[in-house]
Amino acid sequence: MGANIVGVDFSEEAIQTAKSLNEELGLNAQFCCCNIYDAPIMLKGQKFDIVYTSYGVVNWLPDLIQWGQVLSQMLKDGGKFVIVEFHPVLWMFDENFSQVRYAYSRKEPYIVEESTYTDSENDNRQKTVTWNHGLAVVLNGLLNNDLQVQSFGEYDYSPFNLFGNMAAEKNGTFKVAGKNGEIPLLFSVVAVKPSK
């Protein structure tokens, strides 16, 4: 038996890395490189018992109502959606966590253009477009698509040293140094598509 697993990412490099790990571990997962909004079509209407989303996904998505619609389309009746994601409060601060620089939630994207290490030769610039969605936007993306929230959690730690200046904890997680758990860094949601 076993689970049928399909991974979706918009990055071909991430998909190639996942395929290599899949082969190395002797697993039988499949992978699809596409925009998440196109996933129901690209996966030919497949439905799943569980759809899981983890760290660093929501900030790339402009429309969370459409995202919730995709999740609902991809879940079987009675299926669960699980997300563990960086908290929107985290993205309000500068990299030193010393001052608030960005909005908690806004419809307009943040657009950052950065020079690459070869900028002086070819004027190479990389544009990054992200959104900071507040928790109400995330939850309404689910609720407006008939997904029922079963649990919600907030956590004051991160699995990664996001900005290079976070304090390492004994359990391998990271917290904002000097803030003693004052800033939420992660949130989690479990939502279910009702059975008909």
Task: Annotate each PLM feature.
Residues 85-96, 121-137:
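Acceptor-substrate binding/catalytic loop of class I
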Residues 118, 128-152:
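Short alpha-helix
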Residues 49-65:
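A short SAM/SAH-binding and catalytic strip from SAM-dependent methyltransferases
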Residues 80-115:
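Conserved class I S-adenosyl-L-methionine
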Residues 65-80:
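A short glycine-rich, Lys/Arg-flanked "PGG" loop and its adjoining helix->strand segment in the class I
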Residues 1-41:
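Class I SAM-dependent methyltransferase SAM/SAH-binding core
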Residues 41-51:
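A short acidic, Gly/Pro-enriched loop at the edge of an enzyme's catalytic core
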Residues 145-147, 169-196:
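Core SAM-dependent methyltransferase catalytic element
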